[in-house]
Amino acid sequence: MSGGFISRGFFGKRRPPEGMEGRLPPGQYYESGFPVLTVGPTEKIETDAWTLRVDGLVEHAVEWNWNSFQALPRTTYEGDIHCVTKWSKLGTNFSGVSVDELLKLAQPQPEAKYVLATSFGGYTTNVPLADLVDGKAWVADTHEGQPLPREHGGPARLLVPHLYFWKSAKWVTKLTLLAEDEWGFWERNGYHHRGDPWKEQRYTGD
C-alpha cells in the first residue's frame, strides 16, 4: 500500500436535522455529504478482476468472482455511518451481501473469534467476529441505489456501520478468520482495536 493520506468533501454541520440529534455519537458532528478519506491512491479494480475470499478458521475456504458474488442473496442497510475523524452521515443506505451469508457458506470453526479484512492494495483492519454477524455487517456494492464509486471502495467494500468507518475496509478482497486478534494498518498505528463510536474508542487506550 502506497503512502499518503487523501481526504476531501467535508461539508460538516455541527447540528443534525431536527429529530436526529440522538443519532450522533459523542464527539461527532453532522455531515451532509460523503467525505473521501484514503490511505494511498484510490484503487482501480475492474469487476472482471475482482474476487472475494473467506478463509482461515473455516470448514470451507470460499472464493467468489464478481458474477458468483452477484448471484448471492442481497440485503440493504439503512441507517448511519460514523467516521473516526468526527463526521457522521445520517440516513444513508448501502446494499450488498451480508457477512452472515458469506459465513454460512464458509462455516466458521468454533475457535474463530476475530476477522482480518484485507483490501486490494494491502490495507488491513481487524474486527471481532461478533461484530460481523447477526445482521451487523455486509460486503456492499451499491450506495443510494447506485454502484459504489471507486473513491468509496467500489466495486465492493466491507460495511460495519456500528463501528467507526475505518473498520469498513474499502476494496475488500479477503476475510480471514482467526483465533487471536491480529491488528490491521490503523490499529498498529495507534487506533483502537475495536472502534465503537458510542464509547469514543478512537485511539489505543480509549
Indicate residue ranges for each PLM-predicted region:
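Structured, non-membrane catalytic/scaffold regions adjacent to prosthetic-group chemistry
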Residues: 2-206
